[in-house]
């Protein structure tokens, strides 16, 4: 795994994949230590980017309130060390972290508590003097006010300095924050660049690919997957966002620290005043978008499917209940690839289908993405979500006319008479490929593009129910609560007595690997769908298969 994973290493004390969690998790571990009367040190390391997430400050606030021994190391790698400030702060950190200084400080503090008069005034004066001295040199007053002893900033590449500071502060019985400054990619030639150039290069290392034979089962290794020249859904979104902005002045784009990943770099450069990166704060991003929508602005929130989970309450209470037309472009829905189980967008269909008034869609290609986004901008009284994978968009013509699609409308891509496949998103092309192969075997397969996951096309469903005794649903999302569940529920109530097979992600956390590898293993590629159809054809029983 490219992230912390408890099952992989004893040194991964707790799993992680989403940002801003280390302080809260570390505090829980520290309190477990106290509850179990055990003796060890706990240190939570957090990056400066993760400090944009509210969860980090929730943890800091709680730790400061508890006031027990706990160390937070803030790794700040977005700023260089000024020689003057670095020297001053290093000296000051050595001073205030020195055990002798802290012992004298604590004894003097206790002594002032015994003063017969002016005890509180004296202590307040001492605290203000120390804070003023810190304020001249270090940015630590905020953490002091939250109940932490602040040390730093120090050079994180000066190993001797880091070790001596840790030795000095390890026995302090209160919460401590050590601020270290580092340079991202230091020592790696390709990353020793400045500003955005090196940041964009470093972003490539966010997804750590599986290593060696363990990542390539025999049934996968023999397959050669060729890269296609067509744009990705992320490329398409980048172009669409700019196209829409040129034609509509009331639109803005929002992302949560994923400008490059979502394809919003061109938009951010062409429309900087209409581009908002809210940081690792998805909940804030959704409520922020709701505020914009409440005043007539049309916000398009481009957020990874897995990260949008963090904003679920905000989607319901700040957006859907208030009938606000926020557009959610859910990037990396389905299999996210090498980032693994913490990043697969497997749950969005299930967790959005149950939100009242939410429209849930999935384009089969870039052109349909264009039409769905245009349609979303014409909905003024409810949220509209568009899910798409990290994959090729198959077809995209940015010169054609945008079409307004009827809400809840499906599209029959191929007529058939023996089996009906109801496919979601790019799975339509998998279904069409298999339909052609089955046609050569004498089995007629109908393929329906279910671009509207919610609301469903009830007229089309009724037509399918009346004409077919074998139906397959296929989606790149979890089966439980997914599109197939919606179809099976409707068919059951409508009295369907044939066979229904739901294909999707299983009720387990899917491990990492390339999208093609994982889809093959899960039976969601052409070979897997072909086998499902053949098994269904061989099974002569006309029974429910829910």
Predicted feature residues:
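Cofactor-binding active-site loop characterized by glycine-rich and histidine/acidic residues
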Residues: 1-66, 251, 255-256, 264-265
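Conserved thiamine diphosphate
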Residues: 3-6, 31, 35-41, 87-162, ...
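A short, small-residue-rich loop immediately preceding and capping a beta-strand
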Residues: 12-15, 38-53, 70-73, 251-254, ...
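A glycine-rich helix N-cap at a beta->alpha junction
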Residues: 65-79, 320-332
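Long, well-ordered, tryptophan-enriched scaffold segments
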Residues: 77-236
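Glycine-/acidic-rich phosphate or pyrophosphate-binding loops and their flanking alpha/beta elements
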Residues: 164-167, 206-207, 232-247, 263-269, ...
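Non-catalytic terminal/interface segments that mediate subunit docking, oligomerization
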Residues: 182-308, 314-324, 402, 406, ...
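Peripheral docking tails and interdomain loops at the edges
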Residues: 212-227, 337-339, 359, 478, ...
């Amino acid at each position: 795994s490219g992230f912390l994973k408890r099952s992989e290493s004893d040194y991964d004390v707790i799993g992680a994949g989403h940002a801003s969690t280390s302080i809260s998790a570390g505090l829980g571990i520290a309190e477990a230590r106290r509850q179990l009367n055990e003796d060890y040190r706990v240190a939570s390391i957090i990056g400066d980017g993760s400090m944009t997430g509210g969860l980090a400050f929730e943890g800091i606030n709680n730790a400061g309130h508890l006031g027990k021994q706990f160390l937070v190391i803030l790794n700040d790698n977005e700023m260089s060390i000024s020689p003057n400030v670095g020297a001053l702060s290093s000296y000051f950190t050595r001073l205030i972290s020195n055990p002798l200084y802290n012992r004298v400080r604590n004894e003097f503090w206790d002594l002032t508590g015994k003063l017969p008069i002016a005890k509180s005034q004296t202590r307040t004066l001492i605290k203000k003097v120390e804070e003023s001295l810190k304020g001249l040199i270090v940015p630590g007053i905020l953490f002091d006010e939250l109940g932490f002893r602040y040390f730093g900033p120090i050079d994180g590449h000066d190993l001797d300095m880091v070790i001596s500071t840790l030795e000095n502060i390890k026995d302090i019985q209160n919460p401590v924050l050590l601020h270290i400054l580092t340079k991202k990619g230091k020592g790696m030639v390709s990353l020793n660049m400045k500003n955005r150039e090196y940041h964009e290069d470093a972003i490539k290392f966010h997804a750590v690919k599986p290593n060696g034979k363990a990542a390539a089962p025999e049934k996968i290794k023999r397959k050669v997957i060729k890269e296609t020249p067509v744009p990705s859904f992320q490329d398409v979104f980048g172009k669409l966002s700019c196209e829409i902005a040129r034609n509509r002045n009331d639109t803005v784009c929002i992302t949560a620290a994923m400008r490059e990943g979502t394809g919003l770099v061109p938009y951010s450069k062409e429309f900087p005043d209409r581009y908002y990166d809210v940081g690792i704060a998805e909940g804030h991003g959704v409520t922020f978008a709701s505020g914009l929508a409440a005043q007539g602005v049309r916000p398009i929130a481009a957020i990874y499917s897995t990260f949008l989970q963090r904003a679920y309450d905000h989607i319901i209470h700040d957006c859907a209940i208030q009938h606000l037309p926020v557009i959610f472009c859910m990037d990396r829905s389905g299999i996210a690839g090498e980032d693994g189980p913490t990043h697969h967008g497997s749950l969005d269909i299930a967790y959005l289908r149950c939100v009242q008034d939410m429209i849930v869609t999935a384009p089969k290609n870039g052109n349909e993405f264009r039409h769905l986004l245009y349609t979303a901008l014409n909905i003024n009284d409810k949220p509209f979500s568009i899910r798409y994978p990290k994959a090729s968009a198959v077809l995209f013509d940015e010169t054609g006319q945008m079409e307004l699609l009827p809400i809840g409308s499906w599209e029959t891509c191929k007529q058939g008479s023996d089996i009906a496949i109801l496919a979601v998103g790019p799975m339509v092309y998998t279904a069409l490929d298999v339909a052609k192969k089955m046609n050569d075997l004498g089995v007629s397969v109908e393929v329906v593009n279910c671009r509207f996951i919610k609301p469903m096309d009830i007229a089309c469903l009724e037509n399918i129910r009346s004409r077919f005794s074998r139906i397959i649903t296929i989606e790149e999302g979890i089966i439980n609560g997914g599109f197939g569940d919606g179809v099976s529920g409707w068919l059951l109530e409508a009295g369907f007595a044939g066979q229904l097979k739901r294909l999707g992600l299983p009720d387990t956390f899917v491990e990492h690997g390339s999208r093609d590898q994982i889809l093959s293993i899960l039976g969601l590629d052409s070979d897997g769908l072909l086998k499902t159809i053949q098994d269904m054809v061989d099974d002569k029983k006309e029974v429910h298969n829910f």
